[in-house]
Structure formats: C-alpha cells, structure tokens
Amino acid sequence: MGLEFGEHNPRAATDIVFKALPIVKSNLGAELGIESMMQLANVFRGNMEERQGWGYHDWGSWKAYFKTIRKIGQLKRNVNVNKVLTNDFIAPANDFDVSQVKADAQKYSLSAELSKVDIDKIKGRFYSNVVK
C-alpha cells in the first residue's frame, strides 16, 4: 500500500520517509529524495498488466538471478525457486482500496520545500543516468 501511495504522490512518500528517517533527508535533500522514491516505485511496480499485484514474483526472473549469482560464485549450490519464493500472499497483500490510497496521497499536506520540487523535471531526466 505504501508503494501505491508513493506512486500517486512521490513527494508525500518522501516526506513520510524524511520524517521517519531524518538522516535520509540530510543525506539526499528534497529533489534527490523524491527522485529516489520515484525510482523505487518504478522498479517495484513493474508492469502491473503482467503482474498480479505489488510483490508478485516472476519465477523466470528469479531463476535467472539465482543462476547468475551461482555462476559468478556468490552461491555454492543451486537454489530451487519453488522452495524460497511464494506468491501465496500477493492477493491478500493487495486487497486494499486503491482509490482511497490515491485520494489520501493526493490530499497529503506537503512542506514548502517538497512542494517546490518539479516532478515533471525529474521525469524528464529519469533515465538519463542509465548505465549503457
């Protein structure tokens, strides 16, 4: 639910993190903090058309990951994905009122500092730091 909230209002999600962890605010500042929150939401959200909700595990991706880290020596033996992952909790974990979360995110009262951050500017450069 928290990532859904952040998807609808990354500035508000950043404010909540800053209040809970002031060191994050002092280390990142408003703009980088918001951009980081947006990147996290983007990665964790993925393509919701292909997924069955927040937290859904794609077996093929996990198999490839475990195979790769085994190949580079990070694991000593193969991992059976079926023994370490489950999607059994995805449906109940995603059983919340998305429209209410969106409404709560949109009405969140922002500080002046976070209100000034231009989300469209961040989106415009969102992939400019991608390693090619």
Q: Over which residues does each language-model region extend?
A:
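Conserved C-terminal helix/tail region of periplasmic/extracytoplasmic solute-binding proteins
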Residues: 63-132
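Secondary-structure end/capping motifs
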Residues: 1-77
